[in-house]
């Protein structure tokens, strides 16, 4: 029996490490990346460059693999769902959708009695002022942040007469 061909969406550091580890157990890998020079290109059995929302690219990827995983969460849910209709995607697309939004993810964890660090949702300057006692802290975007991107160390709160933003 042949080992399955693993499709990996994303060709960055994690995709590269996964493809390299797969080689050691004779698993073929196909990396799909929107970066033509992604590092994973050098580790995968096959490399497909294209946009994640391009039907031809996605179909070529689906036809080249047996199952799919991804190295980062910022892949549109609709794309993962479409791929999952033809090839199994793990973690499930619904899990990815949950973790794409930090606020939704934290609420889910807390509702399921899983401890998280203390957090508050800040939508404007007024929300920040109400929680000034929590400073210093990190101000994070709720979506599209990764590896420190979308995160800002916040130590002091300056007040002004400016309108609430």
Report residues per predicted region.
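ATP-binding N-terminal substructure of ATP-dependent carboxylate-amine bond-forming enzymes
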Residues: 1-100, 104
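Short glycine-enriched loop/turn motifs at secondary-structure junctions
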Residues: 41-42, 90-91, 113-115, 143-148
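Short acidic-hydrophobic, aromatic-tinged amphipathic segments that line or gate anion-handling sites
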Residues: 47-51, 120-123, 154
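Short active-site oxyanion
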Residues: 64-68, 116-118, 150
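General beta-strand structural signal in soluble alpha/beta enzymes
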Residues: 70, 89-91, 118-121, 139
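Glycine-/Pro-rich loop/turn segments that contact NAD(P) or position catalytic residues
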Residues: 97-136
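ATP-grasp fold ATP-binding core
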Residues: 109, 133-154
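Conserved small/polar residues in nucleotide/adenosyl-binding loops
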Residues: 158-164
